[in-house]
């Protein structure tokens, strides 16, 4: 017998922060009659999704991975950025077994140590301080051939800001007496997560064969040439950097390759291209037999040594719902599917018992400002059908538009993205009302509320540290002030009448009026 459910839905509006300054604020300038009405009629407030409140350094902007881990776990989770930075400052990093083994294996084989990753101070997918520590450690252990393959940012940092980083590493290698920048390429290619293998293949061929669209004798020169081609950091074409003899550095048998990104979602595809024996994303001309190490755990099927394995999170929202015999649905587009599943479940790949998942393909466009609505209509069609089925106790949905279009820096497109999401929310709220359901509307971090850098005048493509909305569309209630993302899971459990496990240190924010 099927039991009719009155679901509670958590709608996560990715990249949707609150900013009082209305200048180039796409969320403010968007026509959002649905959210305006909900804010007027229902209890609402603002909660924190950045810095110490989500386990990041004070003042550090939030991001989707961190946001969803905190949302799903119901506690502040000490993030990889903070954890690894602490290991470096405590001098534990330089004796990390996985990293030391990789460096030593290359030295003993007469090979090179290749270090790849997002060379950025952004702190979202990586941090250049970690990459510097790795370069220093490799040379200190005796490596004389150290090659940095730099993926350029311009997304979590200003669009043209890589010069300072590249110059710093040129100086660093000069100081160390060994090593150099061996290649540069934009993250658009190297860090794709939407199965655009034609992009990833360019980074793979650059590192394994030195196959590049351009070749230069200096990384900064290569970057300046890219700017002259009107390529921002994120989109810099594959560029090989030669040594004084005009030779490129390629990954060879016996070498070590250390991937310094700590965030998993954009590290998975290129990692699989290097290590999976049955990889079929593109034709690999060469597959070097090398020692590959990942900085953190990227996925269950990636079996390379891990320098900093994931810390086990127990009694996340998904696990509690499973243990209490509850049903749940996770739904999003490709771009944020991993976030409502893997990250929301505290880094667990497999679904919990009673957990269904729906993946909606994100549109195949070069950048999402070309289709700011993305696949929101199709996503909402499936979501409304799931609500009407009365099959689920809890539904977790992510609308990626504010973040993905916000990252393009295109203000007009970001406005359209917000308007598309608002229309979809109207359909979802209506469907929930028909079945007696309720919903919480919030976000994981800010982005679209700031589309220009007030200091430089450049497009602002990064996340922000702004507070995010928290709206309860349901029974008459009050909402506590000063909340944070880790308070959301306990709030949901309380709303459905379940006790909150001790591991969840967050506090329920919603108090139903009797």
Curated annotation (Swiss-Prot):
Gene3D superfamilies cross-referenced by the UniProt entry: Alkaline Phosphatase, subunit A, BPG-independent phosphoglycerate mutase, domain B
Q: In which pathway is this protein known to take part?
A: Carbohydrate degradation; glycolysis; pyruvate from D-glyceraldehyde 3-phosphate: step 3/5
Q: Which InterPro entries match?
A: Alkaline_phosphatase_core_sf, BPG-indep_PGM_N, Metalloenzyme, PGAM_B_sf, Pgm_bpd_ind
Cofactor(s) recorded for this entry are: Mn(2+)
Cellular-component GO terms for this entry: cytosol
Q: Where does Mn(2+) 1 bind?
A: 403, 407, 463
Residues given in the record as substrate binding sites: 125, 155-156, 187, 193, 263-266, 336
Q: Where, by residue number, is the active site? A: 64 (phosphoserine intermediate)
Name the positions where Mn(2+) 2 binds: 14, 64, 444-445
Its function? Catalyzes the interconversion of 2-phosphoglycerate and 3-phosphoglycerate.
What is the similarity comment for this entry?
Belongs to the BPG-independent phosphoglycerate mutase family.
Subunit details: Monomer.
Name of the protein described by the UniProt record: 2,3-bisphosphoglycerate-independent phosphoglycerate mutase
The species this protein belongs to is: Shewanella putrefaciens (strain CN-32 / ATCC BAA-453)
Upper taxonomic classification of the species? Answer: Bacteria, Pseudomonadati, Pseudomonadota, Gammaproteobacteria, Alteromonadales
